[in-house]
């Protein structure tokens, strides 16, 4: 089988923005010695205030913006085992109230690098294939804590993911459950996180002769974050976000666009809500 044809089917797996802690390319390439890189730009904004399930008045126009550029990579030792890495650069700002006064906080620089080691079990059947994956992760304290709104918290964090994916020539499903245990930071702590992601994809178009095609997906992301310590704005609470994903691939490269909107939000304390997330990514496999 031509390598371009193989890549055409692999991009069905690459498309998913799964496991908020792993590269979108964590499952490809599948051949021993293969590797891939991706540049992923994420823009998140929020301008509503929440407490519990209620939206609060925001007469001061408080708002939050986070822009993160991810350099993501994967190396496949053998089909069942690979190493992944995510290196973020963060630029963010927010307005908040302190003692009744509006303050502006900013932060920028290298964020916390994430290393993962997916272990996979593939099963091929007539007309479909599926795989199970167990992925330990380590988040390194590489992000600075010096800015007004720190890009890191100085802690070593451990994560574990269990996922299941299923694909046919026309459909792709992925379900992922993961947990982050956050360590003690410098002066403040982030709360632990439990999350579930579901990706449902449709292979809308495929040109096998030229190794190109288009995927359309629905992305669903549910999060539960425990309260942290000494944070001016604690993200603790429960959220569910949904949105579309579109990805075009051509042989060894792919271009991806996604949008995600929070549809359910329950905040432990007053914080920003109604988050909107826009992202674009470009990836290559070798």
Show where each model-derived region lies.
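Outer-membrane pore/translocation modules
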Residues: 91-191, 249
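Residues that define the transmembrane beta-barrel architecture of outer-membrane proteins
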Residues: 33, 65-69, 108-113, 130, ...
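Short loop/turn motifs that connect adjacent beta-strands in outer-membrane beta-barrel proteins
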Residues: 25-33, 80, 123-131, 169-170, ...
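Residues on the lipid-exposed face of transmembrane beta-strands in outer-membrane beta-barrel proteins
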Residues: 39, 71-75, 85, 115-121, ...
